[in-house]
């Protein structure tokens, strides 16, 4: 451009800025005629200013800005076509097309589009609430089913426990304790009978063979804690201790081979043991002789009601002189009834004669003592 046309160019630039400002103000007041205003002004400017390259470019930029300003602005809230409520909003992110804008009514929770129909199905928060309620109902139904199953299982378990317990009339303790009683083989306290799971094992307390006529036989099953002691006190079923037997003086000589096996003579009745109490109280029924033999006196036919302890209390008694022991032994042999071996020894001492040394028939004597000819249980 020549220097002569600079002033014209400057003159064109200043009026163009003023025209653009005026066009913007007019577009804000009335958007409809704003599109035609720049064209007339630009045409007048072009006619007054003559030819130039810049004015057409400025005119095109003004037309684009006015078109951008010509877009429809946000309108006020529309009334809902269903409930006629103004609590509506324009959906910016849920529109399919700007030609048919979409709106949402917050009151009746319905969508509608301009120029379209109203949707009858509620969407949004309402559907979520419905889904939550349905899911809660679905979760509640399995819970109720599991509760019913647990009730049925508990009932079946209780029925099985009652059936395996053998009936509540026989032993109701099993039902209350859940059939977990580990002491089924022993009698229960309170007189309850044990279940008949062990019919082949008779009761030791109620047995008439071990203790005939005793208090435990009459009472049936007694206390379970004393069953072991009564078992030890029984006198007819088990092998007792070695019975001290009286032997002649000839067999006690040092030259005789069996003299060292002779039992010590029995002590007197009022003897004191190493434990500090008398051990002869168990044999007071048969007199001094029965007391001297201690627990083995019951084997010779002496009537007993409670039995004798089978503990080796004879070892705890102090030793007695041979003279006193001999008198006690002779008295013991005379006082015991039914002791055939003691009667036999007494007769041999009284006779003082016979075959063999000391007037005794040695084979017959030992056969009677060891072979069971006298009827004594060994």
Swiss-Prot record:
<feature type="compositionally biased region" description="Gly residues">
    <location>
        <begin position="45"/>
        <end position="63"/>
    </location>
</feature>
<feature type="binding site">
    <location>
        <position position="105"/>
    </location>
    <ligand>
        <name>Zn(2+)</name>
    </ligand>
</feature>
<feature type="compositionally biased region" description="Low complexity">
    <location>
        <begin position="133"/>
        <end position="148"/>
    </location>
</feature>
<dbReference type="GO" id="GO:0005634">
    <property type="term" value="C:nucleus"/>
</dbReference>
<keyword id="KW-0804">Transcription</keyword>
<keyword id="KW-0863">Zinc-finger</keyword>
<feature type="region of interest" description="Disordered">
    <location>
        <begin position="203"/>
        <end position="222"/>
    </location>
</feature>
<keyword id="KW-0539">Nucleus</keyword>
<dbReference type="GO" id="GO:0003677">
    <property type="term" value="F:DNA binding"/>
</dbReference>
<feature type="compositionally biased region" description="Gly residues">
    <location>
        <begin position="323"/>
        <end position="338"/>
    </location>
</feature>
<keyword id="KW-0479">Metal-binding</keyword>
<dbReference type="Pfam" id="PF02701">
    <property type="entry name" value="Zn_ribbon_Dof"/>
</dbReference>
<feature type="region of interest" description="Disordered">
    <location>
        <begin position="316"/>
        <end position="378"/>
    </location>
</feature>
<protein>
    <recommendedName>
        <fullName>Dof zinc finger protein 1</fullName>
    </recommendedName>
</protein>
<keyword id="KW-0805">Transcription regulation</keyword>
<feature type="compositionally biased region" description="Basic and acidic residues">
    <location>
        <begin position="66"/>
        <end position="77"/>
    </location>
</feature>
<dbReference type="InterPro" id="IPR045174">
    <property type="entry name" value="Dof"/>
</dbReference>
<feature type="compositionally biased region" description="Gly residues">
    <location>
        <begin position="369"/>
        <end position="378"/>
    </location>
</feature>
<feature type="binding site">
    <location>
        <position position="108"/>
    </location>
    <ligand>
        <name>Zn(2+)</name>
    </ligand>
</feature>
<feature type="binding site">
    <location>
        <position position="83"/>
    </location>
    <ligand>
        <name>Zn(2+)</name>
    </ligand>
</feature>
<keyword id="KW-0862">Zinc</keyword>
<dbReference type="GO" id="GO:0003700">
    <property type="term" value="F:DNA-binding transcription factor activity"/>
</dbReference>
<feature type="compositionally biased region" description="Gly residues">
    <location>
        <begin position="350"/>
        <end position="361"/>
    </location>
</feature>
<feature type="zinc finger region" description="Dof-type">
    <location>
        <begin position="78"/>
        <end position="132"/>
    </location>
</feature>
<feature type="compositionally biased region" description="Low complexity">
    <location>
        <begin position="28"/>
        <end position="38"/>
    </location>
</feature>
<feature type="region of interest" description="Disordered">
    <location>
        <begin position="116"/>
        <end position="148"/>
    </location>
</feature>
<feature type="region of interest" description="Disordered">
    <location>
        <begin position="28"/>
        <end position="79"/>
    </location>
</feature>
<keyword id="KW-0238">DNA-binding</keyword>
<feature type="binding site">
    <location>
        <position position="80"/>
    </location>
    <ligand>
        <name>Zn(2+)</name>
    </ligand>
</feature>
<comment type="function">
    <text>Transcription factor that may transactivate seed storage protein genes in developing seeds.</text>
</comment>
<dbReference type="InterPro" id="IPR003851">
    <property type="entry name" value="Znf_Dof"/>
</dbReference>
<dbReference type="GO" id="GO:0008270">
    <property type="term" value="F:zinc ion binding"/>
</dbReference>
């Amino acid at each position: 451009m020549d220097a002569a046309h600079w002033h014209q160019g400057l003159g064109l630039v200043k009026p163009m800025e003023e025209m653009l400002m005026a066009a913007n103000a007019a577009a804000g007041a009335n958007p409809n005629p704003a599109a035609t205003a720049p064209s007339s002004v630009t045409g007048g400017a072009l006619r007054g200013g003559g030819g130039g390259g810049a004015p057409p470019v400025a005119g095109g930029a003004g037309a684009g800005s006015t078109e951008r300003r010509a877009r429809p602005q946000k309108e006020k809230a529309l009334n809902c076509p269903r409930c006629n409520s103004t609590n509506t909003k324009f959906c910016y992110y849920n529109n399919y097309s700007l030609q048919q804008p979409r709106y949402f009514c917050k009151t009746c929770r319905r969508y509608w589009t301009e120029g379209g129909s109203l949707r009858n199905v509620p969407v949004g928060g309402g559907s979520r609430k419905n889904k939550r309620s349905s899911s809660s109902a679905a979760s509640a139904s399995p819970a109720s089913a599991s509760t019913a199953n647990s009730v049925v299982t508990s009932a079946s378990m209780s029925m099985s426990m009652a059936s395996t317990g053998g009936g509540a009339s026989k032993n109701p303790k099993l039902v209350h304790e859940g059939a977990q009683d580990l002491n089924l083989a022993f009698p229960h306290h309170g007189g309850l009978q044990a279940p008949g799971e062990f019919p082949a094992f008779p009761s030791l307390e109620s047995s008439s063979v071990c203790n005939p006529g005793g208090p435990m036989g009459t009472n049936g099953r007694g206390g379970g804690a004393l069953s072991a002691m009564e078992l030890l006190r029984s006198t007819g079923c088990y092998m007792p201790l070695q019975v001290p037997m009286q032997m002649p003086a000839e067999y006690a000589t040092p030259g005789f081979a069996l003299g060292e096996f002779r039992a010590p003579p029995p002590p007197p009745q009022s003897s004191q043991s190493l434990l500090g109490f008398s051990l002869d109280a168990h044999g007071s029924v048969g007199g001094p002789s029965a007391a001297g033999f201690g627990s083995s006196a019951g084997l010779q036919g002496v009537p007993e009601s409670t039995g004798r302890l089978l503990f080796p209390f004879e070892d705890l008694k102090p030793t007695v002189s041979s003279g006193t022991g001999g008198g006690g032994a002779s008295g013991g042999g005379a006082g015991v009834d039914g002791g055939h071996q003691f009667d036999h020894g007494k007769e041999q001492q009284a006779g003082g004669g016979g075959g063999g040394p000391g007037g005794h028939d040695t084979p017959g004597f030992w056969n009677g003592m060891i072979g069971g000819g006298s009827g004594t249980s060994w």
